[in-house]
């Protein structure tokens, strides 16, 4: 029944948006009294958290599979592009799930700790690819632009937790590049390419390679 509740909630999010998610509406769709649904999800936020965790786990699994399917010998750029392309394909197939986790925050909702590890899965794949690229000599770690000290401090914490051995310069490029990947996906899904780019597949393929080279070259 938990899966049926979440499926009904996902349909409601697709129809009216996450901010309008209602346990009463979900219970009506399933023919349940609302008090019965509360035994599974005590609040709207609890149900919303379950949907968010599922979405992050789904896109994380997609990224992990894409990485695993490209031999390390093919190099950094091929692996990065494969993961970026797989994440975009998932987003195109599941636009409402993508919007739930990468779109505008839901007013009044504060994500609990339960969402942190699922949310990190895609980022950890990207950082692993970058670490391997550094070790293989595919990424030039030299810096050509001074970095503000506060940024060094923040990146040091990230490196210690998730990217040992990756220099601040390369971490900064990685954050910028992955932001560009998600930005390209969002521009496509939210209609901002309308009237500008017709061939979304070709455009994203180009963007994926450009973001890889943003990381590999100083």
Residue spans for each PLM region:
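Helix-turn-helix
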Residues: 4, 8, 16-46, 50
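Helix-loop segments that flank and shape redox-cofactor active sites
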Residues: 65-74, 106-109
